[in-house]
């Protein structure tokens, strides 16, 4: 407007209109014209700089927030992920967009926003002091974005950057995770690690949920697998001290560790993602995958199983020689069934949910459970010398399956108590 024939009062009036539009998250364009001689050799930039233009008015363009963005931002914040807006828009427009998506709160102050020029003027020490508090950076230039990424990384943050333009390439390249838009430039796509085909921020929240759920499923399998291995190893080792023959044969361990565990891995890996993981805080990059809670579960459950199995070994040792084969078959079946029921507990490890809460989850686990149970029955009834088993009668099967199911019910009671305590 400074290039137009406007009085100071008119400029103030239009500037107020501009600010009002920007505070509504609208982008603005000013329109003006001038008459030029036909023989003028000046280019457009020179003609504009000469001034004396006739002002036509302002056009305000609204770019509405996608309906799913506020929810996605809220999910990310609940998950401990800090969201920051870095844009070339004006401070008013950027702040209003942040307010609309739920990022800017009434209690936020100027410490939580900055312009690119102000950010560049800060020393590294001053910028490091403010970088975690920043929510909005307006009028940002490419190097401002890159510097912000580097400062956040110095603070120990894992940084993901979204961008669609060529000027976003430096920040996309320096971030641990660069996310370009499907409609973005080829330069942005080449500098990024992932391209969002739907250009949706919601896809980022969904990807985080899937990633965390997959990580938790891996932890669940580790809990299940290590419990089996600890109990099996200790049973064989202590069984030798008790003076009994090998409690579990090589072929029996082959069934447990290769076949049964393969089906268990399939079941645990196929557990659908849960939105509950988005209420957890991020783990540190150097955290060991086996947590303190996992160690307690493995050792606690393993010790209980081992106590049961050692008691059985003592009983087997007192059996007449002609009944030892049947007793060892029962020992093997009890060992498998303890792990069988523990598989259900492992599937909800890290939550307070009931095994039966999610019908999809319960159906998938039930399918794998049936396969394992049928396999165990076939091995016992027809394994013979290969698996060192003898057929058992129907009631023995009922007693073993029902008796070992206490593992599941104790887990259900424990999780029920935890849910009650959480409500209180």
How would you name each of these model-derived features?
Residues 308-312, 370-385:
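Hydrophobic alpha-helical transmembrane segments in multi-pass integral membrane proteins
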Residues 101, 105-161, 175, 182-351:
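Membrane-embedded transport module
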Residues 337, 342, 364-379:
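Hydrophobic alpha-helical membrane segments
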Residues 290, 294, 351-371:
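C-terminal membrane-solvent junction of multi-pass transporters and transport-like membrane proteins
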Residues 339-343, 407-415:
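Alpha-helical transmembrane segments
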Residues 172:
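Basic, alpha-helical nucleic-acid-binding regions used in initiation and control of genome expression
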Residues 381-397:
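Extracellular/periplasmic helix-loop-helix junctions in multi-pass membrane proteins
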Residues 1-151, 155, 169, 183, ...:
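Cytosolic catalytic headpieces and adjacent flexible linkers of membrane translocases
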């Amino acid at each position: 407007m400074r290039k137009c024939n406007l009085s100071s009062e008119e400029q103030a009036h239009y500037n107020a209109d501009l600010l009002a539009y920007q505070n509504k998250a609208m982008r603005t364009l000013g329109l003006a014209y001038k008459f030029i001689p036909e023989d003028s050799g000046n280019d457009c930039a020179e003609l504009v700089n000469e001034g004396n233009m006739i002002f036509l008015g302002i056009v305000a363009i609204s770019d509405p927030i996608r309906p799913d963005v506020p929810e996605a931002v809220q999910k990310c914040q609940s998950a401990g992920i800090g969201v920051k807006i870095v844009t070339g828009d004006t401070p008013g427009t950027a702040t209003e967009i942040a307010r609309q998506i739920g990022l800017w709160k009434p209690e936020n102050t100027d410490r939580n926003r900055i312009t690119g020029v102000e950010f560049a003027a800060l020393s590294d020490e001053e910028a490091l002091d403010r970088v975690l508090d920043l929510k909005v950076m307006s009028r940002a230039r490419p190097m401002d974005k890159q510097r912000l990424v580097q400062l956040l990384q110095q603070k120990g943050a894992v940084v993901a950057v979204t961008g669609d333009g060529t000027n976003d390439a430096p920040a996309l390249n320096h971030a641990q995770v660069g996310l370009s838009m499907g409609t973005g430039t080829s330069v942005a796509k080449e500098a990024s690690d992932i391209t969002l085909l739907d250009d949706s921020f919601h896809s980022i929240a969904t990807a985080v949920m899937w990633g965390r759920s997959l990580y938790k499923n891996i932890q669940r399998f580790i809990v299940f697998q290590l419990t089996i291995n600890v109990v099996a190893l200790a049973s064989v080792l202590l069984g030798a001290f008790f003076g009994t023959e090998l409690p579990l044969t090589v072929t029996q361990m082959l069934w447990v560790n290769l076949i049964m565990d393969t089906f268990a891995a399939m079941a645990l890996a196929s557990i659908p993602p849960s939105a509950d993981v988005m209420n957890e805080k991020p783990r540190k990059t150097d955290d060991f995958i086996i947590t303190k809670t996992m160690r307690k579960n493995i050792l606690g459950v393993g010790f209980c199983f081992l106590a049961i199995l050692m008691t059985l070994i003592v009983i087997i040792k007192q059996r007449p020689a002609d009944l030892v084969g049947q007793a060892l078959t029962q020992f093997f079946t009890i060992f498998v069934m303890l792990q069988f029921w523990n598989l259900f507990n492992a599937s909800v490890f890290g939550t307070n949910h009931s095994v039966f809460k999610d019908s999809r989850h319960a159906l998938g686990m039930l399918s794998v459970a049936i396969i394992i149970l049928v396999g165990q029955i076939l091995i016992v009834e027809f394994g013979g010398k290969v698996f060192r088993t003898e057929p058992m009668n129907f009631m023995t099967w009922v007693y073993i399956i029902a008796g070992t199911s206490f593992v599941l019910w104790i887990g259900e009671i424990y999780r029920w108590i935890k849910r009650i305590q959480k409500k209180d």
